[in-house]
């Protein structure tokens, strides 16, 4: 005889318990006589019922019957089908779980009934399995983090050693750039001085040959030059009195007239020298 048949009362019909009378009588269940009737809740089928101590089962059955005040029946299909059909009642798993939790806590330091025993939390083992499966992944992640931290610390220790050569390379590059800039400036200065040196003789030659872009200095007008040329043809050397007269006639100073006659004599001397050389070369056949 199984433990299920020990605490099941087959003589009672499906009705309210005598310990908790109700004003209105509940009609008996309209099931066939060959069905085994139960006075309390049966959570498991007969072959699936756990073979544990009957004391815990009775306490749990009394607790559920006292808290709910109603019963329900389970119908087995004559053994041909293993399924069970619970009759609609006021049974709630949350209420039974709460009352059972209170009962075990008030009685003493007895351990709480396992949820898997009463079928309240069937998915709990899967959760535990997922946690156990996730713990190796967490451990591997922590190991990777520790290895990464050690690697970064080693790199940080090695960085000061590499920092010195890098700083030296940067200094060398900056020095090379500075030296190249200095050389470029020196070359520019040399080129500027060279152009200045070449331009000075060019300007001097242009000034001598009167080929420069600057206009020649011409302080005398045409009328003044003509009057001075006429006087020079008559007399190459002027007295002080004559010089004063000419200066008044052409509206020039005494000094200007004096300088003009000096320059004109030098020009005449140069022309006579060139003419003499030309005559000599033509006579002696120098080519």
From Swiss-Prot:
CDD domains cross-referenced by the UniProt entry: homeodomain (cd00086)
Alphabetized GO MF terms: DNA-binding transcription factor activity, RNA polymerase II-specific; RNA polymerase II cis-regulatory region sequence-specific DNA binding
Domain of life (superkingdom): Eukaryota
Keyword terms: Developmental protein, DNA-binding, Homeobox, Nucleus, Transcription, Transcription regulation
Region (Disordered) residue spans: 70-210
Main location: nucleus
Residues of the signal peptide: none
DNA-binding region(s), residue ranges: 213-272
The keyword Repressor belongs to this UniProt entry's keyword annotation: no
UniProt KW Nucleus keyword: yes
Places the protein is found: Nucleus
CC terms in the record's Gene Ontology section: nucleus
Listed Polar residues bias regions: 93-109, 149-158
Biological role stated in the UniProt entry: Sequence-specific transcription factor which is part of a developmental regulatory system that provides cells with specific positional identities on the anterior-posterior axis.
Sequence similarity: Belongs to the Abd-B homeobox family.
UniProt-recorded name of the protein: Homeobox protein Hox-A10a
